[in-house]
């Protein structure tokens, strides 16, 4: 209480004067019990105090805070106060090698991240066997982006751009929806340099601490060479000595503009590896950790390459052997055919098989004819223009050409006085000197049908 009174004597004086002004008949001022004089404020100040309420300090036991007795058990940690859940607590009996092996199995076989794998182990009270048996019973939440996933996404985006189908080939455990969602969050918060570039820059800054001096020289390019001394320039520099800050600002502005240009066209100035080659942070760190590490890694890669070549050669040998077997054919795998004697085929009618039902009799003329598909197509009515017999055709080409006064041979002599035709009709000889009937009088219905 004395401390509060020491801090605000003016406040106490104002409150007392306000209370005393209402009771005293003078209203202008009065003497207090302590003997000090208190002057009343104008009415405007009193009205402002009335608006904000009574500002006086309240004294008494009813206005003091009640502090309970000290209880050491009440300050213990409770889960209800924080609302969080403990997911991992290290245990001294588990060696680090065994723990790393458990985490690797959980990540590679079951898709857990490190936090989920350790949470499962802590749930089973650091029993690795029970945790490994219980890992397949749960599906981990796949929307977690580890550092490896982020680096792979940056590499894939630098190679393929916004082709999320190609990016998914490098991140097969991520869906296209999750890739698009991460792309927009990464686009807003990303810096123009990738994680690998930042890590390489940190390592370079640790080894080379002279980069800051180079930056200072770039920021002040006019403070460079002593050999480029020019008295006129020096006089101008002395005349403009009152503006050193502006020149430095201009230089910094140019650098910022160049950096902005580099940020907007960062893809052009990047040195990309060839297609099919990818860099990872672990490999770069492993190569740069010691001078002999690069040779050992290259030897391991050579051994892996040789083993892969051997596998390819073995596959080629197996394929060539299979091709040779295929060229031999499948004759040896065919089942043997039954050697049954076959009856000779006859063109005549086959003997009728004994049957109880009577079979219709087929004329012999139709059996001796060829099948319908092999029969020649003949016109329905006999043709008026017939070909001459073969003897007459041969005689036409064998006999010598007649002279002008020699009559034609009797075989091709026309029956009437009409000029000779190119294809004369054959002369049919009949028994008894009877003339053959004309072609018009032949009845086609009496002839058997060839069809």
From Swiss-Prot:
**Limits of the ELM2 domain:** 55-139
GO MF annotation terms: enzyme binding
Asymmetric dimethylarginine sites (modified residues): 401, 413
What the entry lists under SMART domains is as follows: ELM2 (SM01189), SANT (SM00717)
Bias category Basic and acidic residues: which stretches? Answer: 218-240
Regions of biased composition (Basic residues) lie at 261-273
What sequence ranges are listed for the domain SANT?
140-191
Q: Output the Gene Ontology cellular-component terms.
A: nucleus
Q: Where is this cross-link: Glycyl lysine isopeptide (Lys-Gly) (interchain with G-Cter in SUMO2)?
A: 76, 249
* Annotated localization: Nucleus
Q: Where is the composition biased (Polar residues)?
A: 431-451
- Which residue intervals make up region (Disordered)? 1-55, 204-275, 333-451
**Family as reported in the entry's similarity comment:** Belongs to the CoREST family.
Supply the PANTHER family for this chain: REST COREPRESSOR 3, REST COREPRESSOR COREST PROTEIN-RELATED
Q: What is this protein called?
A: REST corepressor 3
UniProt source species: Mus musculus
Gene that codes for this? Answer: Rcor3
């Amino acid at each position: 209480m004395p401390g509060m009174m020491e801090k605000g004597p003016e406040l106490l004086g104002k409150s007392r004067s306000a209370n005393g002004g209402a009771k005293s008949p003078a209203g202008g001022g009065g003497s207090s019990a302590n003997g000090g004089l208190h002057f009343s404020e104008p009415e405007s100040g009193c009205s402002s105090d009335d608006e904000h309420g009574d500002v006086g300090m309240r004294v008494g036991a009813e206005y003091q805070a009640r502090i309970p007795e000290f209880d050491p058990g009440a300050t213990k940690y409770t889960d209800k106060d924080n609302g969080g859940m403990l997911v991992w607590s290290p245990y001294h009996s588990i060696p680090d090698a065994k723990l790393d092996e458990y985490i690797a199995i959980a990540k590679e076989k079951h898709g857990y991240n490190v936090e989920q794998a350790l949470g499962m182990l802590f749930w089973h009270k650091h029993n690795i066997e029970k945790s490994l048996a219980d890992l397949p019973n749960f599906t981990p939440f796949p929307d977690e982006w580890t550092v490896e996933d982020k680096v792979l996404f940056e590499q894939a985006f630098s190679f393929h751009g916004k082709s999320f189908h190609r990016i998914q080939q490098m991140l097969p455990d991520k869906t296209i929806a999750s890739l698009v969602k991460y792309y927009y969050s990464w686009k807003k918060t990303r810096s123009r340099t990738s994680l690998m570039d930042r890590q390489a820059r940190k390592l370079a800054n640790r080894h080379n601490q002279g980069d800051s001096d180079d930056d200072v020289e770039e920021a002040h390019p006019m403070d460079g060479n002593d050999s480029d001394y020019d008295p006129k320039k020096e006089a101008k520099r002395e005349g403009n000595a009152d503006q050193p800050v502006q020149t430095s600002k201009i230089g910094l502005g140019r650098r910022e503009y160049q950096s902005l240009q580099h940020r907007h066209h960062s893809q052009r100035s990047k040195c990309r590896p060839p297609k099919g080659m990818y860099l990872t942070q672990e490999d770069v760190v492993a190569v740069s950790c010691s001078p002999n590490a690069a040779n050992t890694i290259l030897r391991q890669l050579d051994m892996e390459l040789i083993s892969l070549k051997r596998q390819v050669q073995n596959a080629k040998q197996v394929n060539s052997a299979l091709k040779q077997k295929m060229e031999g054919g499948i004759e040896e795998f065919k089942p043997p055919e039954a050697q049954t004697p076959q009856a000779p085929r006859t063109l005549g009618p086959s003997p009728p098989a004994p049957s109880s039902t009577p079979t219709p009799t087929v004329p012999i003329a139709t059996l001796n004819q060829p099948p319908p598909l092999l029969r020649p197509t003949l016109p329905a009515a006999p043709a008026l223009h017939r070909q001459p017999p073969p003897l007459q055709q041969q005689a036409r080409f064998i006999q010598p050409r007649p002279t002008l006064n020699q009559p034609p041979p009797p075989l091709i002599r026309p029956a009437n006085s009409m000029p000779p035709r190119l294809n004369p009709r054959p002369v049919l000889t009949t028994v008894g000197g009877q003339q053959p009937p004309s072609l018009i009088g032949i009845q086609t219905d009496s002839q058997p049908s060839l069809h």
